[in-house]
Amino acid sequence: MNLKKLFFASALLFAACGTIQAQEVIAHRGFWTTDGSAQNSLAALVKADSIHCYGSEFDVWLTTDNQLVVNHDATFKGVTMQDATAKVCTAVQLDNGEQLPTLQQYLDKAKSLKTRLILELKAHKTPEQETRADRKSVV
């Protein structure tokens, strides 16, 4: 009886070991908790890649002139992303001195990096804005 239990436990352990996989790290808003970085900044994306993060999540808003900008908060430094133009949004200075990036700038920077991008399209005020943002974000 003990031999059966030992065999069963060994088989179970062997099966479990075969299914264990390495966990991958995804940087939330990039690697922004380091010097010279800020949430969703180009620097945060590059720094996430520099520490070999599997991916980097970032947030996207649609502006009134149908441009996509990268920022976490609906309103940041007095500018409400979905109620402003891209020109107004990108004039906002991030905490590391960078200008708030457009999605295109973010994608262009990512082309030379290995980290994967995880785009979070933020919830917009109206279904129409949601639909436009959805369509615009599909690259």
Protein language model features and the residues they cover:
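Bacterial Sec-dependent N-terminal signal peptides
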Residues: M1-E24
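Phosphate-group recognition and catalysis centered on beta-loop-alpha active-site segments
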Residues: Q21-V139
